[in-house]
């Protein structure tokens, strides 16, 4: 039995990132698309961490295009793609596009390209090849109007589960919803293609009814019947997974899923996500640790850490992702304790227990698809 740990995903390994957009244009939209691409290219060129891009046209179908961009590492790209500036930059292109699919890859090997000296030095150490588990993880987060929390919880807990299978190769495996105050976090696990699964789920009548019931309670209004409004809402709500680590071997019985909410001080979200990812790497190698698997989600100054654990209260320090000396002090510097109602240093188990109680999100529903 394999009992080793594996990290199936990490935005913090230092490897270069290749982002690929597959674009299918509306008929007659080619010139508008090219103008929009020039606008986007000029804006992206000045973003720190962006190395370059290419625009390619299909030789079989001129309406199909491929945009690739390369980034020094994943964090600068994630900061850019989650920004309001990105939303405004890509808006002119959206009217031209019938369908668009985005994919992100770490550059693991490369031949036949002359790299600048600094990049050559970085490339002398090859990026790690990850052992995947066949699952893509993603989260959405949004806020509801204060005072509507209990109503929203009832709506989210009461809907009928949608059909899990999107097609022969894609299925929704697990959906878990949490709340912390007026913030909602929905995490999903997908076997196959994430975008295919999300589109499939969004079309299901059970889900559409829930989304409509939520609309009056949202702080940020949306019109799901308007493609541009719906697209903007879900882009702003996206909270990508930036790290996932798990122990190999059989899953212990009695695991419970928790989501821990870490609001960061302004500008510290990526540093906080990186700290938790590094700590989870260390913890996964300890067979006595309470956490069997963990996923770190990050957007702007919000970090959510999803953990499957037996009993976090018995070891609050490690359940919070704190291992070794001084890590509590580092976390305290990055964390917006006032937003959690917990201020001051994290110097002992009592402080950790208090923080764990304030950071632990309320579980609304946890649904697994039937195995098929």
Predicted feature residues:
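Short S/T/G/P-rich N-terminal loop/turn motif that feeds into the first structured element of a domain
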Residues: 1-64, 72-84, 92-93, 98-184, ...
